[in-house]
């Protein structure tokens, strides 16, 4: 009886540890897939930058003012710069 109880408790402990380890591994894999902090900061900054806005300075004579454009691996989508 004691041997069976010890075996059941040991099996339960191993199962709990295995489940916890599997969850931690899954979380670490999800973190590896995500972008590094430096890229996240760039995305946050660029997300706030509108790439297709009217000029801050009004037209001078016949010259059209230039609209801001995305560059460096970014493209304009829905009036916002997004990473290509």
Swiss-Prot record:
- Principal location listed in the UniProt entry: secreted
Does this entry carry the keyword Signal? Answer: yes
Q: What family does the entry list? A: Belongs to the neurotoxin 12 (Hwtx-2) family. 02 (Hwtx-2) subfamily.
Taxonomic superkingdom: Eukaryota
Q: Which GO terms describe its cellular component?
A: extracellular region; host cell postsynaptic membrane
The record ties this protein, via PROSITE patterns, to: HWTX_2
Q: Note whether 4Fe-4S occurs among the keywords.
A: no
**Where in the chain are disulfide-linked cysteines found?**
51-65, 55-76, 70-81
Sorted UniProt keywords: Disulfide bond, Neurotoxin, Postsynaptic neurotoxin, Secreted, Signal, Toxin
Q: Which GO terms describe its molecular function?
A: toxin activity
Q: Which residues form the propeptide?
A: 23-47
Q: Name one Pfam family in it.
A: Toxin_20
**Annotated localization:** Secreted
Signal sequence range? 1-22
Q: What is this protein called?
A: U4-theraphotoxin-Hhn1a
């Amino acid at each position: 009886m004691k041997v069976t109880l010890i075996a059941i408790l040991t099996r339960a402990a191993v199962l709990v540890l295995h489940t916890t380890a599997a969850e931690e591994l899954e979380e670490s894999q999800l973190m590896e897939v995500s972008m590094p902090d430096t890229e996240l900061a760039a995305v946050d900054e660029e997300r706030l930058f509108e790439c297709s806005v009217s000029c801050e300075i009004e037209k001078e004579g016949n010259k059209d003012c230039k609209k801001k454009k995305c560059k460096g691996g970014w493209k304009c989508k829905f009036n916002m710069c997004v990473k290509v």
